[in-house]
Amino acid sequence: MNLWRHSPEELAAYNSCHPMKLGSGVLIQLPLYDNSAVYAEDITFRSFCCERVPVYVSTVLRNSSPYRYLDEVINDWQKFIQVSDYVGGSAEYAIYAVILSITSNFVITVFLTVICCINISGRAYKRILQLLRIASLLASLNLTIFITKVLRRLEKEHNVYGVVRAHSIMHIFSDDMTFVVLDFLATLMFQFCQVGIVIRLFQRAQEKRIIFFIGVILTITANILWVIPPFANHTTKHRNDWQILRPFVYLFRIAIATSYASIVIYHIWQKKKLWFKFNQMGLLTLLTILVVLLLPGFFLADVSNLWISELGEVFNTTCYVTSTVITWEWLDRLNVLERKEEAQSILGRPIFEEEQQDYRFAKYALRVQNALTRRESQDASTDRHDTSSNSEVCDLQTISRYDPEDQISVGRSIDRMHFNDRGTYKDVALKKLGYARDKILYFTDQIVQKSVGHNNSSSSKNEKTKQRKAMVRKRLGLDKPGIYIYSTKDVVFNSDEDDDENAEDEDDDEYEVGSEGNNNSSATFTSDHIGHI
């Protein structure tokens, strides 16, 4: 039991849990004889209680017995059913409602785990998708073990005491270390997946870096602080000293869940023109809004001591599964719609300056410009009068040969003379810090690209396309070495038309002269014709 939720004074309120002197004049019916009884002179009665709370049998035998209950027992029963708490007897906290809520969460978690393992796929987000599947499997396994232990405990209490109590189920959340460890690992992985989802919502590399650093730090801090009190209950004697930590960590988790829900809902509002066009996408969007709001909603309801108080761990696991899996599916479908719209648009997709590592777009543009400049200068030096359109063609060999980075190092200018000076200690320290920062950013970008996905400008081919190309090459016989495909093309030169016009002019001149000229013209025509052929 968490002391920050319930104070000890609320539990000591039932008089039937204390011994009561009934006095004399009581007849007790013998269990083996129907029409016999024993007269008792002095009787002390005390109800069966567990942790200073009476245990009642939820059956229909209350009014069927001809004997009445004691006044203290009746008063305690009326008080018991008015307590809206997990130690009370209200209908919300009856054993039937608790079992129904636990099994419902178990069914939802297993269903979403199956969907995550079968339906959701993505080669660009392979690492984070594997983490999501592992987290879903851990959550399903944890709830399976939890329900098994609950049923065994209820069976034991039914056989020993003849009653089943919802109160005993609540102790499993904090006393069972298997549930605590698996819940800690599943929650940690789900929050890492939520960090990956938020990273996918943004396009700039700098924004992804900031989200990665802040999200990982907040996730690790919140989960480590959350798991300290359950472990302290089993390792230290002063277990009540750590209970003061839980309300602050609970508020911390509420803030993280609210931030995640706010970011997702804001992105949904920004993309309303896409998902509003399709009915199925609209229903999935409404479901996404509902599930991302359930997590902070259940946190607040658990703190406010409503029906799910002390059942929050089961509901939190289900909320983490739904808010992660359904949001991931919605984001995948939204990306498909965005790619279709960008393909039909004139502008296409946006390209940011820092989208590629090491400024690949800028370097490629510099290489192309340098190669074109060198090609034009070489053509001008060899033949200044021959201007052809082929001089503007830039082949890959020329681009790869002339690289401005091979001649001018990064960070140096051609108009400045550099010496091998070590500089001051401040400059060296700043240089070392800058180098360390660049390395950290580099590894961060590698983690983000490999786990969350590639950048927008990277052209990645899927496996199916490669398989189809390999099949076509095999059918054509191109998989063998030394085999190529050539395409025929008709080429017309401008010099052919000029030669034909010159030949016609010479024929006209030869027909005007005499027979001697005719012989010469025929020889000339023949030689010209042969030369033309």
UniProtKB/Swiss-Prot annotation:
Which InterPro entries does the entry mention? PalH (IPR014844)
Listed GO cellular component terms?
endoplasmic reticulum; plasma membrane
Q: Which residues lie on this side of the membrane: Extracellular?
A: 1-94, 149-178, 231-247, 302-307
State the residue spans of region: Disordered. 452-473, 494-533
Q: What is its main location?
A: membrane
Which residues face the membrane's Cytoplasmic side?
A: 116-127, 200-209, 269-280, 329-533
**Segments traversing the membrane:** 95-115, 128-148, 179-199, 210-230, 248-268, 281-301, 308-328
For this UniProt record, the keywords arranged alphabetically read as follows: Cell membrane, Membrane, Phosphoprotein, Transmembrane, Transmembrane helix
Query: Which residues does this entry mark as bearing Phosphoserine?
Result: 409
Annotated membrane topology? Multi-pass membrane protein
**Biased composition, Polar residues: where in the chain?**
516-527
| Record GO biological process | ascospore formation; cellular response to alkaline pH; cellular response to pH; fungal-type cell wall biogenesis; invasive growth in response to glucose limitation; regulation of vacuole organization
List compositional bias (Acidic residues) regions by residue number: 495-513
Please state where this protein is localized: Cell membrane
Please state which protein family the record places this protein in: Belongs to the palH/RIM21 family.
Briefly state the protein's biological role.
Required for the proteolytic cleavage of the transcription factor RIM101 in response to alkaline ambient pH. Required for growth at alkaline pH.
Name assigned to this protein: pH-response regulator protein palH/RIM21
- Annotated organism of origin: Saccharomyces cerevisiae (strain ATCC 204508 / S288c)
